[in-house]
A protein has these predicted regions:
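C-terminal structural segments of small proteins and small subunits
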Residues: 51-82
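Intrinsically disordered, low-complexity segments enriched in small/polar residues
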Residues: 7, 26, 37, 78-80
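Short, flexible active-site loop motifs that bind/organize anionic cofactors or intermediates
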Residues: 2, 46, 64
Length: 82
């Protein structure tokens, strides 16, 4: 599955809520999100209009590592929710 190229920080924030991530704080244009599913895990999401593809892939890879699955599986769960 291809990574969406026009996702904003707000889009990613909304999608990550499916996996139990909640906004815990915001500093400037960066949002810190935390999940307590399968242990506590934090990711920082830039609140930009369009996320750079490498940034989006890195966040998905980090989330996948936490949930012990592939980035493809995470992306399927996120896109399947909407």
């Amino acid at each position: 599955m291809r990574v969406p190229r026009q996702w904003s920080g707000a889009d990613l924030k909304e999608a990550l809520s499916v996996l139990g991530y909640e906004e815990t704080r915001q500093t400037g244009s960066h949002i810190r999100m935390t999940t307590r599913m399968r242990g506590e895990h934090h990711v920082t999401v830039p609140d930009h209009r369009v996320l750079p593809l490498g940034t989006l892939r890195a966040i998905l890879r980090d989330v996948a590592r936490h949930f012990e699955c592939t980035s493809e599986e995470i992306l399927t769960r996120l896109l399947g929710s909407g």
